[in-house]
Curated annotation (Swiss-Prot):
This is Thiazole synthase. The lineage of its organism: Bacteria, Pseudomonadati, Pseudomonadota, Gammaproteobacteria, Alteromonadales. Keywords: Cytoplasm, Schiff base, Thiamine biosynthesis, Transferase. It comes from Shewanella halifaxensis (strain HAW-EB4). GO terms for cellular component: cytoplasm. Homotetramer. Forms heterodimers with either ThiH or ThiS. GO terms for molecular function: thiazole synthase activity. The keyword Cytoplasm applies.
């Protein structure tokens, strides 16, 4: 069971709502993935009604919503988006995203840390999306973030765990849940992230862009469970040398 800010999740697969061809496909794929936390961009919401056509169906399925500040370019815009989401959705949970570069969507570490500090002081449950920077993740933990969400590779790239070396350090040092976010493009990559000791993964593009998002959602659910079970069971040590698993020639010397 994964606990974030006193909220428990049985599933360690978190999902997104973007890039699906249709809302019905998205809802069915999320259900197939067994995800219990779904992130959605605040900019998708209707400012007049505080919802969009997927909000109620998600809530009806018992999914916890994690609004995100995607599109925010600085501290001011991110805080405004967080305030807006709390007013519209009645939640103090926020996925903090600040990426001023529209081409590569790299998160701004300086603006993110400052926004996280302010939002934590205001009582938000902050889950920041950041580079796989162990020092930054430690600082975010110190200002009160409920979890950290380091990227595996650029958003939507499906490149997998390009930052594996740094993810290992973050996982080793963290005292809050580590959720690998962005770049996971295949179920095998999600399994590997969980084998490293990640507490959860967030997957969107790999499911939404699949030719069969519903089937892919099921695949990711199985992959995450397998990776977690392998981590708990304990993986064997990696060696650069061969080690025999049974005696090779000892019996030849017996008389």
């Amino acid at each position: 069971m994964l606990t974030i800010a006193q909220h428990q999740f049985e599933s360690r697969l978190f999902t997104g709502t973007g890039k699906f061809a249709a809302s019905e496909i998205m809802l069915t794929a999320i259900q197939a993935s067994q995800s219990q936390l779904v992130t959605l961009a605040i900019k998708r919401l209707d400012l007049k009604t505080g919802s969009d056509n997927i909000l109620k169906p998600l809530l009806d399925r018992g999914v916890k919503l994690l609004p995100n500040t995607a599109g925010a370019r600085n501290v001011k815009e991110a805080i405004f988006a967080a305030h807006l989401s709390r007013e519209m959705l009645g939640t103090n949970w926020i996925k903090l995203e600040i990426h001023p570069d529209p081409k590569y969507l790299m998160p701004d570490p300086i603006e993110t840390l400052e926004a996280a500090r302010i939002l934590c002081e205001q009582g938000y449950v902050v889950l920041p999306y950041v580079h796989a920077d162990p020092v930054l993740c430690r600082r975010l933990e110190e200002v009160g973030c409920a979890a950290v969400m380091p990227l595996g590779s650029p958003i939507g790239s499906n490149q997998g765990l390009a930052t594996e070396t740094f993810l290992k350090i973050i996982i080793e040092q963290a005292n809050v849940p580590v959720i690998v976010d962005a770049g996971i493009g295949a179920p095998s990559q999600a399994t590997h992230a969980m084998e490293l000791g990640a507490d959860a993964v967030l997957v969107n593009t790999a499911i939404a862009s699949s030719s069969d998002p519903v089937a892919m959602g099921r695949c990711f659910a199985q992959a995450v469970n397998t990776g977690r079970q392998a981590y708990v069971a304990g993986l064997g040590a990696v060696s650069h040398q061969a080690h025999n698993t049974s005696p090779l020639t000892g019996f030849l010397n017996d008389e």
